[in-house]
């Protein structure tokens, strides 16, 4: 269940970012989003043997674990389409945090599709312990969870520090990172389909070309990561203090000064619009 729980904080951040950047007070299908996360969390406990399709389970067991694993894709898909429905009808503002969110939705979907493919026990017998699995879980983790973390960081950095990062550099950094991670992990689908196994330190020469491209992508990602650190450093050095936030006040946290002062409220704030 660990990997399904791992993505839940990311889901929450993406919901916050997308609803706020859309200028809406909540996501589409707010209650359905909550039930979807509960369903993902609960189903995560009854699908463990999808890691064990190659150990010789009988056909009924394989059929069950294939089906149960695929059912996890349903609430996940509900979340994806609810985010898209939240964006519907708004003029999309391609701010850095919005770019990270859109990148998250797209790449997490790609990782989810390869996950549905791997859920098939008959196919998984061939693909088990190949780089296809590595490509799958890096699309949902290195481009799902990490993109959510990056999106959350650039979105709430002004709230935590009261300083602005350079949005132009942030966009350059996003696209550099996007190209880097895709160049790293997309060829691994091909390596897996060609039968390259996981957890070996060396490989036959036939796999060299895709591995070179994958390595090039990792260098690009490294450059993008260093660029991000440089952007944070530049922000802290130049101290561009935010005087007039342009945020839609769909959330109470943006009403205060940035960063919020101690004892901001004389009384408990009233919650409305459930």
UniProtKB/Swiss-Prot annotation:
UniProt key word RNA-binding: no
Residues annotated as transmembrane: 28-48, 65-85, 98-118, 140-160, 174-194, 212-232
Major enzyme class: translocase
UniProt keyword annotations, A-Z: Copper, Electron transport, Heme, Iron, Magnesium, Membrane, Metal-binding, Mitochondrion, Mitochondrion inner membrane, Respiratory chain, Translocase, Transmembrane, Transmembrane helix, Transport
Pathway(s) where this gene product acts: Energy metabolism; oxidative phosphorylation
GO cellular component: mitochondrial inner membrane
Keyword Lipoprotein set for record: no
One MF term in the entry's GO annotations: heme binding
SUPFAM superfamilies cross-referenced by the UniProt entry: Cytochrome c oxidase subunit I-like (SSF81442)
InterPro entries: Cyt_c_oxase-like_su1_dom (IPR023616), Cyt_c_oxase-like_su1_sf (IPR036927), Cyt_C_Oxase_1 (IPR000883)
Record-level GO BP terms: electron transport coupled proton transport; mitochondrial electron transport, cytochrome c to oxygen
Subunit and interaction comment: Component of the cytochrome c oxidase (complex IV, CIV), a multisubunit enzyme composed of a catalytic core of 3 subunits and several supernumerary subunits. The complex exists as a monomer or a dimer and forms supercomplexes (SCs) in the inner mitochondrial membrane with ubiquinol-cytochrome c oxidoreductase (cytochrome b-c1 complex, complex III, CIII).
Function summary: Component of the cytochrome c oxidase, the last enzyme in the mitochondrial electron transport chain which drives oxidative phosphorylation. The respiratory chain contains 3 multisubunit complexes succinate dehydrogenase (complex II, CII), ubiquinol-cytochrome c oxidoreductase (cytochrome b-c1 complex, complex III, CIII) and cytochrome c oxidase (complex IV, CIV), that cooperate to transfer electrons derived from NADH and succinate to molecular oxygen, creating an electrochemical gradient over the inner membrane that drives transmembrane transport and the ATP synthase.
Protein name: Cytochrome c oxidase subunit 1
Organism whose genome encodes this protein: Choristoneura rosaceana (Oblique banded leafroller)
